[in-house]
Amino acid sequence: MDREPLSSGRLHCSARYKHKRSASSSSAGTTSSGHKDRRSDYDYCGSRRHQRSSSRRRSRSRSSSESPPPEPRHRSGRSSRDRERMHKSREHPQASRCIGVFGLNTNTSQHKVRELFNKYGPIERIQMVIDAQTQRSRGFCFIYFEKLSDARAAKDSCSGIEVDGRRIRVDFSITQRAHTPTPGVYLGRQPRGKAPRSFSPRRGRRVYHDRSASPYDNYRDRYDYRNDRYDRNLRRSPSRNRYTRNRSYSRSRSPQLRRTSSRY
């Protein structure tokens, strides 16, 4: 009578233990399957990302291979096409009412130029290019006609003729705007470490070079400037003066030391 409830109790405990193991195994299976699913999803997404990045790289490489290489630029910043276009415009300028007369004699006056070109049509104005320093003609001028046909006729008729012993060249002007007078002096940026021609670094004054001066005078000026610069360096550097003072002091004391040593 007593053994029956014990067997039934043992059976109940074993059933509960089996139920727990089955539940734990099922949960472990779900977690493992969940991990597997996550890994598979990650692998799928990673492969898709890899495919996208590789396709982007291919498209970039194709676009870079298809695009032409950049044009080499000149020191002035202009490309080769711009320089070719400018060269062509200089060789074959467009027809305009302004013509340029080049190769003139520096003694040819504006009045003579007007008499020469006035027979082809009414002239609006003549601009002689004058040197600012010498106040003389630089050998070319610009003539503005009122009509384009008159400017074309003057160009075709007067190009190559001889005026005051010089054969002139007539062509259309490259620029369509009014020409500004040239100052006769270089107005660009000066290179580093160099002063303008008319400026002397010594005492900051202007020096006017005389062509009749002898080479000895130039040598003397350079020698004086070198001595002045050496004196300024001596005055500015105290360490060099200290060294010279110590050296003179040692020279003055050296004979006395020798005499005292000889006594003993």
Curated annotation (Swiss-Prot):
Which one Pfam family would you cite for this protein?
RRM_1
Q: In which tissues is it expressed?
A: Isoform Tmaj and isoform Tmin are expressed in males and females. Isoform msTmaj and isoform msTmin are present only in male germ cells.
Instruction: Tell me the InterPro entries matching this sequence.
Output: Nucleotide-bd_a/b_plait_sf (IPR012677), RBD_domain_sf (IPR035979), RBM (IPR050441), RRM_dom (IPR000504)
Tell me which PROSITE patterns the record gives: RRM
- Chain positions found as Phosphothreonine: 180
Segment Linker: which positions?
Answer: 176-196
Q: Which GO terms describe its molecular function?
A: identical protein binding; mRNA binding; pre-mRNA binding; RNA binding
Q: Which GO terms describe its biological process?
A: cell differentiation; female sex determination; female somatic sex determination; male somatic sex determination; mRNA processing; mRNA splicing, via spliceosome; positive regulation of mRNA splicing, via spliceosome; regulation of alternative mRNA splicing, via spliceosome
Instruction: Describe what happens upon changing residue 173 to F.
Output: In a15, loss of female-specific DSX splicing and male fertility
Enumerate composition-biased segments (Basic and acidic residues).
71-85, 207-234
Q: Where is this region: Disordered?
A: 1-96, 179-264
* Modification note: Extensively phosphorylated on serine residues in the RS domain.
* Residue ranges with Low complexity bias: 23-33
Q: Basic residues composition bias: which ranges?
A: 13-22, 47-61, 191-206, 235-250
Q: Per the entry's comment, what about the domains?
A: The RS2 (Arg/Ser-rich domain 2) and RNP-CS (ribonucleoprotein consensus sequence) domains are required for both male sterility and female-specific dsx splicing but the RS1 domain is dispensable.
In Swiss-Prot or TrEMBL terms, this protein is called: Transformer-2 sex-determining protein
Tell me which species this is from.
Drosophila melanogaster (Fruit fly)
